[in-house]
């Protein structure tokens, strides 16, 4: 109705969701994965809003870039997804209210981070409430679960632990340490670690990158005697900078399926966003989470 093709709208929605994902721990799957790895390795995980100061800068600069520059590179492929008219369907206000309140309650519990209610337990309880109140059928709930993603994340969580315990993480850390030198500046540390993780996430996807690279980051932090939390934050933000290829995040692949955008479209729009994210990180890390 606004005269904008569905394919262009979907890519704008994709980037908007990614910008917003930087604002909280659960905004992007890779953020939550980082917290999980930190907990597994004996570190206190990031809080719900620890990432927020960085996310605000990324959201503001990212939105300005996309509005005035990036949107000019979005072609209209002419493809119309099957759900393009979903907004025209009649809304069940009762179910929508229940689902909205349930989601809000889950987010509040996660934000409060009570010791006896882990994040995943709160999410499962919320899902059961939605199904129990018939906002969603059991069949639809089962189909909504991305089983491939669950298996991938579960497997890579074990692999990330193995990388650390086997010494492979230390070996990879030494390669990066050779690049950093004996007395690297905080700027050099942030730059090398950020681009190593950001490059990996473009070809490997964000969650696997976090699960595999975070143990390496902790080894680097120990070797050069800097805060492991600062290094973890750099890796987390770099891993979430999944803009430049269709492979960088599951939602990118979904968007390609719906819009038929090309690899080159993501590169043209996404690379500047990776650089914007880096700019925010290199400025904000010394302020909000110094080494």
Model-derived regions: residue spans:
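Hydrophobic alpha-helical transmembrane segments of multi-pass integral membrane proteins
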Residues: 25, 182-220, 224, 228, ...
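Membrane-interfacial loop-to-helix junctions in multi-pass transporters
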Residues: 2-9, 45, 94-100, 146-150, ...
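Structural signature of hydrophobic alpha-helical transmembrane segments
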Residues: 27, 55-61, 116-127, 175-189, ...
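Short helix-coil transition sites and intra-membrane helix breaks within transmembrane domains
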Residues: 21-30, 115-119, 162-169, 199-212, ...
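Cytoplasmic-side transmembrane-helix entry/capping segments in multi-pass membrane proteins
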Residues: 8-15, 143-152, 213
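Juxtamembrane and boundary regions of transmembrane helices in multi-pass small-molecule transporters
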Residues: 2-15, 20-85, 233-291
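Hydrophobic transmembrane alpha-helices of multi-pass small-molecule transporters
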Residues: 50-174, 190, 273-274, 278, ...
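Alpha-helical transmembrane segments of multipass membrane proteins
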Residues: 18, 37, 41, 107-111, ...
């Amino acid at each position: 109705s606004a005269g904008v093709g569905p394919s262009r709208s979907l890519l704008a929605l994709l980037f908007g969701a990614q910008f917003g994902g930087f604002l909280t721990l659960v905004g992007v799957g890779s953020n939550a994965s980082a917290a999980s790895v930190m907990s597994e390795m004996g570190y206190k995980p990031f809080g719900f809003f620890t990432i927020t100061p960085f996310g605000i800068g990324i959201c503001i600069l990212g939105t300005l870039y996309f509005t005035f520059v990036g949107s000019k590179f979005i072609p209209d492929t002419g493809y119309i997804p099957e759900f393009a008219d979903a907004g025209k369907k009649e809304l069940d206000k009762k179910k929508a209210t229940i689902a909205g309140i349930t989601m809000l309650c889950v987010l509040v519990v996660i934000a409060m981070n009570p010791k006896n209610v882990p994040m995943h337990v709160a999410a499962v309880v919320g899902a059961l409430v939605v199904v129990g109140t018939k906002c969603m059928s059991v069949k639809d709930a089962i189909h909504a679960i991305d089983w491939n993603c669950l298996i991938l994340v579960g497997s890579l969580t074990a692999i990330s632990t193995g990388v650390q315990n086997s010494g492979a993480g230390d070996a990879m850390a030494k390669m990066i340490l050779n690049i950093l030198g004996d007395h690297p500046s905080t700027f050099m540390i942030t730059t090398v670690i950020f681009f190593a993780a950001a490059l990996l996430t473009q070809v490997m996807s964000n969650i696997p990158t976090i699960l595999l690279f975070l143990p390496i980051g902790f080894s680097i932090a120990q070797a050069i005697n800097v805060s492991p939390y600062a290094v973890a934050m750099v890796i987390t933000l770099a891993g979430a900078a999944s803009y430049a290829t269709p492979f960088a995040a599951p939602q990118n692949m979904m968007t390609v399926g719906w819009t038929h955008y090309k690899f080159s479209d993501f590169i043209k729009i996404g690379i500047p966003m990776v650089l914007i994210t880096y700019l925010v990180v290199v400025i904000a890390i010394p302020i909000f989470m110094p080494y």
